[in-house]
A protein has these predicted regions:
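General structural signal for secondary-structure boundaries
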Residues: 43-52, 56-57, 61, 72-78, ...
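Intrinsically disordered, low-complexity regions enriched in serine/threonine
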Residues: 1-35, 114-343
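Feature for intrinsically disordered/low-complexity regulatory segments and propeptides
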Residues: 1-81, 87-92, 96-100, 104
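A short acidic/basic microdomain associated with nuclease active sites
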Residues: 86-132
Length: 343
């Protein structure tokens, strides 16, 4: 993706309250190197960073059993970038961040008889089973609850969900759009910003699905929902009650669990959120007597970054939904039994 774009007249963003200028002055071209600052990754766990060029030049593209190619990771990324550039015409995009995991190694036929220690890089084939990427829109940013946030777009692909031994079949992808906190790179996904599992036969379907998602997502409405979380406070006693209930939830009988909101955060996520409550420099106690529901959401979203790539988006959305639900329970507006986590 281009790291700098010329600003062009845009007709897509009127619902966000932006002015559509008739004349646009030449944009100031800002080097990405000048703007780039160190920031945390949007997902951690067992992932590693990779560039788009490395994906295109160093990685093979696996095929199905009938030798039809799968849609490559880089093609997936390009289609989302193209859809974003079309829908958000005139905006300036940041670099695309790519995280991968579960490296699958193979050998070229000429290296079949070599021992492992004799292998050279050119003897091996590589592809990554799981991949997540995101990029933010630099020119669409806001400040809520004292934090700068950017509109962010991305996707997830997990080849472990495909039956590569069979004939070509619909391939599975996930696309998202939502706000991301600049200081910690935490995503704040809601149900209207996530496609769920998308099954497609070709990359054109990815492009179309991305446009549909962008059209139905309301950034300002989403932002107002997130902003209200900063107005509801949680005492230390209430936080401890929430953590205890989250642990208890995981061992409840299925019949009782059905009566409660769905929570898919695991033990490691809950432990990380608890630790963050004490020592997170941005959203922890920091000498305060209380934290807000906004802080709770950030602690849970930060903890969700330790999930595997194929579970990450759902857990991030679940963390956001949970914080919103707790706020409603504290305001006596609870209709989904989130109050159970406070009793």
């Amino acid at each position: 993706m281009e790291t700098t774009n010329l600003l062009l007249p845009s007709t897509r963003m009127t619902r966000m309250g932006m002015v559509n200028p008739t004349f646009i002055e030449d944009a100031v071209i800002v080097s990405e190197k000048e703007q780039k600052k160190e920031h945390p990754n949007f997902i951690e766990s067992n992932t590693s960073g990779i560039t788009l060029e490395e994906l295109e030049t160093n990685c093979i593209v696996p095929s199905f059993g009938d030798n039809q190619l799968t849609i490559s990771h880089q093609t997936f990324i390009h289609r989302i970038e193209e859809a974003a550039s079309m829908f958000f015409a005139g905006e300036t995009f940041g670099n695309t961040e790519i995280r991968v995991s579960h490296k699958i190694l193979g050998r070229h036929p000429s290296a079949l008889t070599k021992r492992k220690e004799e292998l050279k890089p050119e003897d091996e084939t590589i592809y990554y089973q799981r991949m997540a990427f995101c990029f933010h829109i630099r020119t669409i940013c806001r400040e809520i609850n004292g934090e700068e946030v950017h509109l962010c777009i991305g996707g997830v692909r997990s080849l472990n969900e495909e039956n590569l031994y069979g004939k070509k079949s619909p391939e599975k992808f996930k696309i998202f759009i939502g706000w991301r906190v600049r200081v910690c790179s935490n995503l704040m996904l809601t149900c209207d910003g996530l496609t769920g599992r998308l099954e497609v036969m070709g990359d054109t379907d990815i492009y179309i699905a991305a446009l549909k998602l962008f059209q139905t997502f309301n950034p300002e409405q989403n932002l107002r929902l997130l902003e209200t979380l900063g107005r509801t406070m949680i005492s230390q006693e209430q936080f401890c009650q929430i953590i205890g209930r989250l642990r208890l939830y995981q061992v409840l009988p299925a019949s009782q669990m059905k009566e409660l909101p769905k929570v898919i955060l695991g033990d490691s996520n809950i432990n990380a959120a608890t630790k963050g409550y004490i020592d997170n420099p941005n959203f922890g106690l920091r000498g305060r007597a209380k934290i807000s529901c906004w802080d709770l959401m950030q602690l849970l979203n930060e903890a969700a970054k330790q999930s595997y790539i194929d579970k990450f988006l759902e857990r991030n959305q679940n963390a956001t939904d949970f914080a919103v639900g707790i706020q409603k329970a504290l305001r006596w507006e609870d209709t989904e039994n989130y109050g159970w986590f406070l009793r």
